[in-house]
Amino acid sequence: MHLTKTWLAQLPLTDIQQVQPVSGGDINAAFQIITRHHQYFLKVQPHNDVTFFDHEVAGLRLLGAVTKTPRVIASGTIATDGYLLLDWLATGTGSQSALGAAVAKVHHQHHAQFGLDHDFTAGKLPKINHWQTDWATFYTQQRLDVLVNLAKEHHLWSETREMHYHRLRQQLLQDSHMHTVKPSLLHGDLWSGNYLFDTTGTPVLIDPDVFYGDREMDLAMTTIFGGFDTDFYQAYQAAYPVAPGMQDRLPSYQLYYLLAHLNLFGETYGPAVDRILMQY
């Protein structure tokens, strides 16, 4: 995507000196903007209005109340494109222990119910966040079922997968009384690409997809693609111990993220989905 001078002139910035594309995202166009006195990170969603970024802004503010996140400068619409303007953060190195403590601090933020005060349906994977008092109901109906139905639409589902998924779903609902869950604020997409360390070594959480749910969902995501080491888990456990049996529950939460990748990237993730489904 090319940003014209006319487009850039509508940003709430003065004296823009340089604009550099930034790689790494597959959803938004991203740029580093350098002015005379400051640097900014700009996300642009082509042909999508400002509401596309409302969910991310809300998430950054919720997380930012208890841990470091990029500061939101502005969001809006230019021409037909939604944009989100953030502070540019120079990166450094930091400790996994500090990251684990930061995530635990986020999870200590609780709510009376599971969900969020708004849905997010502008992306490729709809997030239905209607409030629920029962976690198993929320997770099966508003997370897993949504992605399974999407996989069916994408012709990525089979009778075998449906049979095993039905068994998993029933077990989650039947066994919900065995696992007491307190609604925690979740990052929602906690993989290694969504944290960094600033130049002081402070952990920074980015690109959130927040809601209130079982904190083991965030922890499950950390186990799928790597990027979190023993120090992270030890620091997390010291700050907010997990309930016994978490290792047995993690696959059912890993399934959500693997279903997301199945829908986004296709059958490459099918074997990983099947490995979990076949346990039921």
From Swiss-Prot:
Record flagged with keyword Transferase: yes
E.C. number: 2.7.1.-
A Gene Ontology molecular function term of the record: ATP binding
Binding, ATP: D87, W88, L89
Enzyme class, broadest EC rank: transferase
Reactions catalysed, as given in the entry: N(6)-(D-ribulosyl)-L-lysine + ATP = N(6)-(3-O-phospho-D-ribulosyl)-L-lysine + ADP + H(+); N-(D-ribulosyl)-cadaverine + ATP = N-(3-O-phospho-D-ribulosyl)-cadaverine + ADP + H(+); N(6)-(D-erythrulosyl)-L-lysine + ATP = N(6)-(3-O-phospho-D-erythrulosyl)-L-lysine + ADP + H(+); N-(D-erythrulosyl)-cadaverine + ATP = N-(3-O-phospho-D-erythrulosyl)-cadaverine + ADP + H(+)
Keywords: ATP-binding, Kinase, Nucleotide-binding, Transferase
Entries under InterPro entries matching the protein: Fructo-/Ketosamine-3-kinase, Kinase-like_dom_sf
Keyword Transport: no
Origin superkingdom: Bacteria
Active site: D189
Function, in words: Ketoamine kinase that phosphorylates ketoamines, such as erythruloselysine, erythrulosecadaverine, ribuloselysine and ribulosecadaverine, on the third carbon of the sugar moiety to generate ketoamine 3-phosphate. Has higher activity on free lysine (erythruloselysine and ribuloselysine), than on ribuloselysine and erythruloselysine residues on glycated proteins.
Family: Belongs to the fructosamine kinase family.
Protein's UniProt name: Probable ketoamine kinase lp_1983
Species lineage: Bacteria, Bacillati, Bacillota, Bacilli, Lactobacillales
